[in-house]
């Protein structure tokens, strides 16, 4: 009896011990999850907004090098870093590089006394010697351009008595007037240059209309923001919309489209609260198209039917994020974004960098970086995204993707199945996101023109997001629609290397639509 009691007690203690261990494991996972949340919030509030995370250890193969490959975005050229014993400094751009695209005005300072101090003869110029450059700023100026039409009179009419006998004195004299260009905005003093500057200031420089109003006042003109808003809406309908429709037709004629969307607040939407968030959808052409066409589309909701409304029966490839609304595009072939996968893995990295060597999140980032490194190699770019050699031909790129990239993708998803993160953790969400998107993340292998990420569309969203931080909201749906069309023109012109303000002036003076490239 005593032995049985002891055995039962041992069994009960073992069961209790197992239960406590299980509970401890659950609590540890909960602590890990909560710590991840705290670290993420700290990073969001106090940390760097960049995803550049570098950990180098060339002597230890287990250490990782978490490069910035996935988030390179055809970004601006960065200054070369030069190592100095005590610190690092950025190599300065040369003066010639800074000033190379500006017009030049030469000033020759003449010798005041051109009498030879040796013999008294006159001295003549034989050359000029360069002294220095200076960068000159000419403040903007406003002036009135008064339009007149010439009136001409025939010098012969009225003097031929036999021919003009039946005409009265007024009809005998023949006059003609020149044709004046139509006013850009009827019954206004708006010029192409003025309106182009207002639109450029708002949509390229992110200046809200109240600041433009103040700027005009500083130049001596009382131009209200209401007047400017009305001008913008009218010109968008009359001049921007025809160009927008041509851009849309060209976008839809291509085999690949990048898509994304972001929030916008519109105050006076019928039947909706002013606090309700609307959406600005963004569509753009791929890099392989040779043109950068960006189209913004204002919609009241995020529903996937908005993408269907814009793209219609488009049957090409659509590169996008993991939003399920894109599944409504039943004719199109959806492709995923590895930058989103990598970003979620970066968010799951331990705050202690010493743990990166054994972190599953870091291993995931490293695997993503291998994919991005190969893509850059195929495109002839270095690790900073700069073009350093000729890219592979489409045929060669397609072949090497299937030979070299596809096995890495297979390994990546097989590895994901072995990761067992704490439920609800950042890592769990990152793993689940990648697995949910698996079908679409293989999509870029189908066509060499499809990019591995949707960074192109995210870059196209950025100008709108920057502007939104300043002007905060649109007053009406008409204003939001006008903004969508004008953002499309301004951003596309800029992406294609044009001076957007000069492009707008030419467009406003033209009788036919002019594409921004």
Regions found by a protein language model. Name each.
Residues 1-6, 113, 151-153, 159-517:
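Catalytic center-proximal scaffold of phosphoryl-transfer enzymes
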